[in-house]
Amino acid sequence: MNPFAKVLLCTTSLLAAIVVLPSAIFAWVDPTTVYARAWAILAAEPYVKQGFHMHEDYWCGDLASGKKKAVRQQLFKGNEYWFWLGTEVDHAKVSVHIYNSDGELAEQRDSWAKDHLAAAHIIPKTTGSYFIIVSVEESPAARTHWALAYGFR
């Protein structure tokens, strides 16, 4: 390869790396999703101390006040699960409930909701698909970002 072609190839490769890599390395993340997830993790903290293993994956989105979102999850008999919901919006009220595949409420009585945090507890009687219903009951924001995390033991 002649010297000019080598320099041109190296320069082009370097320029491509400068243009492409920063966008891959510094991908933009919506800060409201990060804050909502931080609140969900905060709700999970006491349960993690009790031996629940928190999954790294989570669900997130935004909802208008009074709207709901269903998330389907495979749960296994013999395990115990907590689902933690959080939002960064002050004065928002959120809730989370768990239903079995027949549409019956399946969560334990110790599930709770307080302001912009909520949690639902389930000990599945059977292995199968369950539906976790996330709801923004009320919010001062037009759209309320939320994040749902879960753990098991």
Question: Which role does the model predict for each range below?
Answer:
Residues 57-67, 111-112:
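Extracellular beta-rich ligand/substrate-recognition surface
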Residues 55-58, 102-109:
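Surface-exposed loop/edge segments in extracytoplasmic proteins
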Residues 87-94, 139-141:
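Extended, low-complexity, turn-rich repeat/linker tracts enriched in Gly/Pro/Ser/Thr and Asp/Glu
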Residues 28-48, 52, 98, 129-153:
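C-terminal edge strands of extracellular/lumenal beta-sandwich accessory domains
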